[in-house]
Amino acid sequence: LHLERTKVTVDRRGYIETNEFLETNAEGIYALGDCNGKAPFRHKANYEADILSHNLYLRTEENDWRFAEYDLVPAVTYTYPQVGHVGMTKEQAEAAGYTVSVGLHHYSQTSKGYSLGMMEGKVDDGFIKVIVEKKSGKILGAHVIGEQASILFQPFLNLMNAGKHLLRAIHPEIGSEQTKVLRAKKYVRNLEPNVISTINETMVPHPALSEVAMWT
């Protein structure tokens, strides 16, 4: 990239430092995807590209800004069986101070799983585990091992992403004048659960058939 010819700074690993609006420390230069070191997934790059295109070209209202958050980046391992997850594990949630409830359900305990020949105790009997804050019922994490895992945890990801999002500074030292204004006013973006834009602003793991529904 010949960054030495610019004023763009990198971290100790060599990744370009970006803030929540994908800005670098050089005015007018943005960075997204693997080069900023924030989760090396195609769907994370898609998410960042959507944010940039919205803010730079598609925004129609003055107070309509999108910003990046990285605590709900889904991941899928396309092995047999598939493994998919988003959010916290039970151990991570408890370490963060949450009192949690854990729900676990096997494929074989459903009619569809049984009709597919999945039986309790067999190696192909997948399961989904959901981590919830006990008091509020807030979903903290969803984890699936089994057939089509990449699809099965998408509804939880959608629900986890819905609601009010308070702007949180990433690299506070990086920021345009507009970014500083939004930080100072504690900008909030509200993603209603029954509005199509909320689906559009939720990550979907790539490649997964859930992209068919999420990109409609």
What are these regions (language model features)?
Residues 23-24, 69-70, 120-124:
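Solvent-exposed alpha-helices and their adjacent loops that cap or buttress functional pockets
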Residues 79-89, 94-216:
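Flexible, glycine-rich terminal cap/loop adjacent to redox cofactors
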Residues 32-94, 151, 205-216:
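A conserved FAD-binding loop/helix module that cradles the flavin
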Residues 6, 74-75, 128:
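Small-molecule pocket liners
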Residues 15, 74, 99:
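A residue-level signal for beta-strand positions that form part of recognition/binding surfaces
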Residues 11-13, 72, 125-127:
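Short beta-strand-initiation
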Residues 28, 73-74, 140:
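Short amphipathic alpha-helical segments
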Residues 1-62, 155-158, 169-172, 183-190:
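FAD-site-proximal beta/loop scaffold in flavoenzymes
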